[in-house]
Amino acid sequence: SWEKFIELTGELGKPLVMRMNLNQQSDGAMWTLHRNLMSTLSPIVDCGVHYIDVMCQMTRSKPVQVYAIGARLTEDIPAGNYNYGQLQIRFEDGSVGWYEAGWGPMISETAYFVKDVFGPKGSVSIVAKNAGGAGKSASIESHSKTESILFHHADLDKDEMFAKEDLVINLED
């Protein structure tokens, strides 16, 4: 679950590096829905607030700097809007976060599912096995599933090899 994901990031130390996205390659009815949404907002605004909230929960800190860029990749949306964007956020505790979102038939499915956090003591990632398959990037459900969590410990032994094996937590939600 997202609660478990957030909880495990508390074991990583500070500062945190948080990488998340919500890219959706869309066609047909989903492209129509996305175009209609983009008449008033962008993908970065639609879902970005939720991901920033998750980052605030992970850091228990406030954003102090936000940088944003966007690109309009189609003539099918209003001239003042864009269908791809990314945010970079710096928090009071020194943590940093990156979030990107894009909608449309031109969006790549290769890296549409990134939910990844690392700190001095290791990393925690949501791993999408089934939800991350080809043709699933437009599915809202696939972006919110937490099929499994990969917990990597950065501890090294005397030979500077990893002291602990990665832990995979299988989830059903």
PLM region spans:
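Predominantly a Rossmann-like dinucleotide-binding segment in NAD(P)-dependent oxidoreductases
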Residues: S1-P78, G85
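Homeobox/homeodomain signature
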Residues: L8, H34-L37, D53-C56, I107, ...
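Active-site donor-binding loop signature of nucleotide-sugar glycosyltransferases
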Residues: M20-L22, A101, G119, L171
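Residue-level signal for pocket-adjacent positions within structured domains
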Residues: L33, M38-T40, A101-G102, F162-K164
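A short glycine-threonine-serine/GTX helix/turn-capping micro-motif
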Residues: S39-V45, S108, I169-E172
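Contiguous beta-strand/loop segments that form the cofactor/metal-binding neighborhood of enzyme cores
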Residues: H50-K136
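C-terminal glycine/acidic-rich active-site capping loop/insertion
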Residues: F91, V114-D173
